[in-house]
Amino acid sequence: MSAGGAGGGEGRAPFARFTDQVCGQILFRPAHRRVREELTAHLEANAYEGAQVHFIGHLQTNKVNKVVGKVDLIHSVDSERLLRAIDRQADRLGLVQDVLLEVNVAGELSKGGCTPDEAWELAQLAQSLEHVRLRGLMAIPPIAQKPGDNTPYFSIMKKLYVDIKEKIAHNQDDMDCLSMGMSGDYEDAIAQGATLVRVGTALFGPRPPMAKQ
């Protein structure tokens, strides 16, 4: 479960406490530059010790060293370059980093993510690397205007997830995460097999605007 972005202002502080104390999970989608900087500083300071921390959002290859080994799961691997960079950093640290492949299931130009065909290639690569563990797939479809709008996209993701798990994964038990669905469509996502949803707006209302620097 995710608020869609923690650390984005005082209005989101209750969510961070809620996930830390009740769920034991903090999931970040650092869409704003200042939020990314604050998150990086908190990770380096090990401020979330004891919580399960997930990273959602674009991860630059030059920032991999600030995230690998400091979060439990990276949701947004979408290129060979990034996957190999994560593997190299995990190798340096002597650990295995859990990752999800981000799939741009609707082919939206404004969003990151690989194509479904590229997901097959990245999944095969992940199986050959020693210091990453592929846990599943992640997708962020278009904003749903009404119930059922995103069911076709969720169905595509479920099939892709099952096919990759059955045909590529060396250990199918490792492939246990299908991260998709937000406040407007999480019920449809769960109906299609989602294991992780991001419902911060449904729980706590709209995110307050970022203060201008």
Region locations from a protein language model:
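Active-site-proximal glycine-rich helix-loop-beta segment
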Residues: 193-195, 200
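Active-site loop ensemble at the mouth of alpha/beta enzyme cores that anchors a bound cofactor
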Residues: 210-213
